[in-house]
Swiss-Prot record:
The lineage of its organism: Bacteria, Pseudomonadati, Pseudomonadota, Gammaproteobacteria, Enterobacterales. The gene is nuoI. One of its GO terms (molecular function) is quinone binding. It catalyses: a quinone + NADH + 5 H(+)(in) = a quinol + NAD(+) + 4 H(+)(out). NDH-1 is composed of 13 different subunits. Subunits NuoA, H, J, K, L, M, N constitute the membrane sector of the complex. Keywords: 4Fe-4S, Cell membrane, Iron, Iron-sulfur, Membrane, Metal-binding, NAD, Quinone, Repeat, Translocase, Ubiquinone. [4Fe-4S] cluster 2 binds at residues 70, 99, 102, 105. Residues 50-80, 90-119 form the 4Fe-4S ferredoxin-type domain. It holds the Pfam family Fer4_7. NCBIfam families: NuoI, PRK05888.1-1. This is NADH-quinone oxidoreductase subunit I.
């Protein structure tokens, strides 16, 4: 061992002590999760929910677009029809043990019924408990888009209402008037 190696080793130890001393009073980087909640970005994709309209009806019209676009095939539903002609899912099931939280189902939904919320606490001991039914997913409010109503904007007529009669709905466009 040479004198040069001893001096380098000594200054390395001194430098380490100064680095520890400089950071001893700084804020710790580690979060103690259950006690301290972590910051989630506003667009964080977490748990999937189903929302309702302002009038309390389900927004989902069972169009099956969410199930088709899902890359892991974790969404299943069956369409049924009410007496007024409105479609709704007879059952709606999401298997969260397969879901990768990609958000494609939210993008594909024309009614804004499916929304991803910033909630990631979905762990469970049994895999079958991660299969959520419609009653588990349906919330009482409109979610992120409170003023959106698919039937008011889509031009789909319900029994007892004509297309274009609602306040926020535009009259149907006659395509032949647009031609030169």
């Amino acid at each position: 061992m040479t004198l040069k190696n001893i001096i380098i080793g000594f200054f390395t130890q001194i430098r380490s002590i100064f680095m520890i001393g400089a950071n001893i009073f700084s804020k710790p980087e580690t979060k103690l999760y259950p006690e301290e909640k972590v910051y989630l970005a506003p667009r964080y994709r977490g748990r999937i929910i189903l929302t309702r309209n302002i009038d309390g009806q389900e927004r989902c019209v069972a169009c099956n677009l969410c199930a088709v676009v899902c890359p892991v095939d974790c969404i299943s539903l069956q369409k049924s029809e009410k007496t007024d002609g409105r479609w709704y899912p007879k059952f709606f099931r999401i298997n969260f043990s397969r879901c990768i939280f990609c958000g494609l189902c939210e993008e594909a939904c024309p009614t804004a019924a499916i929304q991803l919320m910033p909630d990631f606490e979905l762990s469970d001991f049994k895999r079958q408990d991660l299969v959520y039914e419609k009653k588990d997913l349906l919330i009482s409010g409109p979610g992120k888009y409170p003023n959106y109503d698919f039937y008011n904007f889509s031009g789909v007529t319900l029994k007892g209402k004509k297309t274009g009669d609602l306040e926020i709905q535009a009259r149907p466009i006659d395509v032949k008037d647009l031609l030169p």
